[in-house]
């Protein structure tokens, strides 16, 4: 799994690279559920290996994601962005206060795909933690027949990475922040494969 991720050729603009790396403080990495495959490489390449904990569904459906993150060298907190339980919220707060990053998929764990749930901002608003919104456009990838059409970029293919930094001061109004962040995530995540790529939704 690690070798697969490291074979990918990430491309980014200087502006996006600055957004990825400008914060020495803990951040919440926010990306759509179908781009989770990239999460470990994002942490390794752009967050200087800072420990990161991913929020994963407490249901049986989240078991495979926990296994994936374990193989990728990341830890998990069981819960969901739609119904963030007290134990999961407390655990994420502790992770941030220990100086580590957290990862959140605002449309997880069961969708609908690209539906930003306000619960995703509970912990970041409470701890005044900035966000890193992640975008990815794949040159060549497979897609699974899952609710989110999960992307599996082909080994050695190019991935065009985007990033937007959202300071904690912009999260105070929950409804306004949810709408603005959702719009930005849609903007930096075009749902298309490059013309030279091959999309196989039948996997």
Q: In which residue ranges do the predicted regions lie?
A:
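Conserved beta-strand termini and adjacent loop/short-helix elements that scaffold enzyme active sites
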Residues: 11-15, 57, 79-82, 164-166, ...
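Non-catalytic C-terminal accessory region of glycerolipid acyltransferases
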Residues: 2-6, 71, 75, 86-203
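Polar/charged alpha-helical tracts
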Residues: 15, 19, 44, 48, ...
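A short, well-structured juxtamembrane/interface segment
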Residues: 2-26, 38-39, 44
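Residues that cap or initiate secondary-structure elements
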Residues: 16-18, 35, 60, 110, ...
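Short amphipathic alpha-helical segments and helix-helix/interface helices
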Residues: 17-21, 66, 120-121
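Short amphipathic alpha-helical segments, especially helix-boundary/capping motifs
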Residues: 15-16, 39-43, 65-69, 94-98, ...
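Catalytic core of membrane glycerolipid acyltransferases/transacylases, capturing the structured
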Residues: 25-83, 143
